[in-house]
C-alpha cells in the first residue's frame, strides 16, 4: 500500500466578511485552519482520498463541486473520495447561509489549493 499526506492552510482573510463570527476577528489568528489530505493507493486494489476541512459546515452544492473536481483530478470514483469537516465554531460556514455568499471567493481559493495539493500527492506516494 502507498500513501501520501498534505496539510494546506485555509485560514480566510480577516476582513470582516464572516456573516456570523463567533469570535472577535480584530484580535487576529491564534491558530490557522487547515485542509488535511490523505491519498491511499492499494496498488491494484483501489484507492481513496480523505479530505478533512477545519470549517463549521459545507453546503451540499459546494461539497458536490469539490468532490467532482477531486474525482476528476484523481480518477477515483465518488465513493472513494471522502470529505469531512471538523465542525469548528471558530471557522467559516461554507455555503449560502441566510442568502449570504460573501465567502465564495475564499472558498474558490480553498478548492484551488486542495486540488493543487492533490495533484502533487500522486507523485509523493510512499510505501506504508
Region spans (language model):
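Conserved beta-alpha junction segments in alpha/beta enzyme cores
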Residues: 1-84, 88-128
